[in-house]
Design a protein with these regions (language model features):
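Short, conserved active-site loop motifs that form the nucleotide-linked donor/cofactor pocket
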Residues: 63, 239-240
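Alpha-helical scaffold elements adjacent to nucleotide-binding pockets in ATP/GTP-utilizing enzyme cores
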Residues: 48-52, 152-159
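C-terminal segments
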Residues: 108, 115-141, 158-225, 246, ...
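Short beta-alpha junction loops
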Residues: 40-42, 148-149, 288-290
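Short helix-loop capping/hinge motifs at secondary-structure junctions, enriched
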Residues: 92, 118-121, 149-153, 226-230
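Rossmann-like NAD(P) dinucleotide-binding subdomain of oxidoreductase/dehydrogenase enzymes
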Residues: 1-127, 144, 299, 303
Length: 344
């Protein structure tokens, strides 16, 4: 049978995208009691969900929202039977070795253009980079090009530059907003990691908003080799590294990827990509990296972590209930009882 591994499931929720909260709802369906520690940046989505679940009949002993600081958050993880935590490399290093914690770390999603017609797929690259505000782990942060990598970088930068800066409350806002200090810190961090990479986008990424805060304009950088360390940099705004790639580079630069969009006619390469353990999802053809749908696992099914197979062996016939005095077993019941006890 399919059995739970525990009773209480703790979630240290992220604040990058509302859709991440769809995952822990599955734990409720499996019979877990769920405790959610929301992100301080975006506590609204889990609050709405928990409120709706309360109205639907779930009790406070079944699902609870626990806003806490980071110190108490770790206590929550330790007290639960199982936990799911989101974060960057530091979180992955802290919890990654524990079997009772599911770490949702950096996605480092990628696009491979290797069909000889890279110019036809610019829209797919732009969607993969900028879709959902580029805040999701399934947004592409690196593009590998078998061909004209500089040309692809320029076209992607041109298309992304057409995104209009809007305050976050606007209906047509696309770019994520930050405190001005945070936006400038992200820009400075990016500049400090360029090394030999060429910044294709404009030099000033920070766009301060009249009402306060700022958004970061998209950043496109061109690298000179597929194994450059910058391809692993993932930032919470449209930021993508474009690198040359050839069949001689193989699968190695494409590893450690949540979602890889692979546009190539090479079936042998596709087979190797699908079989590569460090690549969680492979989209073949013009399908953006953030493409998801009902029944399609994002990073495996949550049930694979929360549940396990359990063997239960029992007699084919249960022990019968006591009968009123004088009432006799039917012939069939008598035969089955004899069979169970080895008398038939």
């Amino acid at each position: 049978m399919w059995a739970r591994k525990g009773e209480v499931f703790a979630v240290l929720a992220p604040g990058n995208h509302p859709a991440t909260h769809a995952a822990w709802l599955e734990a409720l369906a499996m019979g877990y009691r769920v405790a959610i520690r929301p992100s301080r940046r975006e506590p609204f989505t889990p609050h709405r969900l928990v409120s709706a679940l309360r109205q639907a009949g779930f009790g406070s002993d079944q699902v609870v929202l626990l806003p806490t600081d980071h110190t108490v958050a770790d206590v929550l993880v330790q007290a639960a039977d199982l936990a799911m935590v989101y974060g960057g490399d530091e979180v992955a290093a802290t919890y990654g070795a524990r079997a009772d914690i599911l770490v949702q770390g950096p996605g480092r999603s990628k696009v491979l253009l290797a069909d000889g017609h890279s110019e036809r797929h610019i829209a797919t690259v732009v969607d993969s980079v900028g879709g959902h505000g580029a805040t999701a782990c399934v947004n592409a942060t690196a593009v590998f090009v078998d061909g004209d990598a500089p040309g692809v970088a320029r076209e992607v930068a041109r298309s992304l530059s057409e995104i209009v800066v809007r305050p976050p409350e606007s209906d047509d806002a696309v770019l994520p907003a930050f405190r001005v200090e945070r936006a400038k810190a992200l820009q400075n961090y990016l500049r400090g990691r360029l090394d030999t990479a060429e910044m294709i986008s404009g030099p000033d990424l920070v766009a301060e908003l009249p009402g306060g805060g700022a958004v970061l304009r998209p950043a496109v950088m061109l690298l000179d080799r597929a194994d450059a360390p910058q391809v692993n940099i993932e930032l919470p705004f449209p930021c993508v590294w474009v690198a040359p790639w050839s069949p001689a580079d193989g699968v190695a630069p494409l590893r450690n990827t949540l979602t890889l969009t692979a546009i190539t006619p090479d079936e042998d390469l596709l087979t190797r990509l699908v079989e590569e353990p460090s690549i969680s999802n492979v989209h073949v053809g013009d399908r953006p990296t953030f493409l998801m749908g009902p029944g399609l696992p994002h990073d495996g099914h949550l049930a694979e972590f929360l549940m396990r197979s359990k063997t239960v062996i029992r007699d084919r016939s249960p022990v019968p209930l006591p009968r009123p005095e004088g009432e006799r077993l039917t012939g069939k019941e008598s035969f089955r009882m004899r069979e169970v006890h080895g008398l038939g």
